[in-house]
Amino acid sequence: MLKLHGFSVSNYYNMVKLALLEKGLPFEEVTFYGGQAPQALEVSPRGKVPVLETEHGFLSETSVILDYIEQTQSGKALLPADPFEQAKVRELLKEIELYIELPARTCYAESFFGMSVEPLIKEKARADLLAGFATLKRNGRFAPYVAGEQLTLADLMFCFSVDLANAVGKKVLSIDFLADFPQAKALLQLMGENPHMARIMADKEASMPAFMEMIRSGKR
């Protein structure tokens, strides 16, 4: 059985978790916060989450894990059959990660954990996020899903990145990135109605106290 190592507060962990649930695959969840301790680095070379444990060993990096699951496991397809359309899904996924998720992450400390972020970092995040959302508007199809009519891997990155980025915009940057992006708002609502999302969000809520205690203590 596949084992998913990580924790339910992590958006990247939840992307993989949603893929496994959508495909109807059995899997075991293993709490793992990563870090630089030797035992953590044996599981994840960079000490990051998530990690997928397979019969052949451990895999890190979310996009790699998602591709591995899609290539090796049965169940609902999360990539189209056509090679070009597959590439478009991966293109959208990578654009959302590079130009929305990662810039927003630079302000997570202030947005979600009550810490301060340097003004220059916030200025760069604002510019990068404006460009990132403009990119998504140009390239996303939203029919109603990011890449078209079917749920794909791009939607997993979308639903666990765009909501956080918009929260950063409102709380830290004084901007609503979705104010003129009704298609993205509609897709977030649609994804929120997915029954698997209810489980994921409940697990996230239940895990939050332990996660916050870990943050306060500085221990992993």
UniProtKB/Swiss-Prot annotation:
The subcellular location is: Cytoplasm
Q: Which parts pass through the membrane?
A: none
What are its GO cellular component terms? cytoplasm
- Xref: CDD domains: GST_C_9 (cd10424), GST_N_family (cd00570)
Keyword vocabulary terms for this entry: Cytoplasm, Transferase
Domain spans labelled GST C-terminal: 82-211
Top-level EC class as recorded in UniProt? transferase
Query: Its Enzyme Commission number?
Result: 2.5.1.18
| Entry's Gene Ontology molecular function annotations | glutathione transferase activity
Which parts of the sequence belong to the GST N-terminal domain?
1-77
What function does this protein fulfil?
A: Conjugation of reduced glutathione to a wide number of exogenous and endogenous hydrophobic electrophiles.
Subunit-structure text: Monomer and homodimer.
What protein name applies here? Glutathione S-transferase
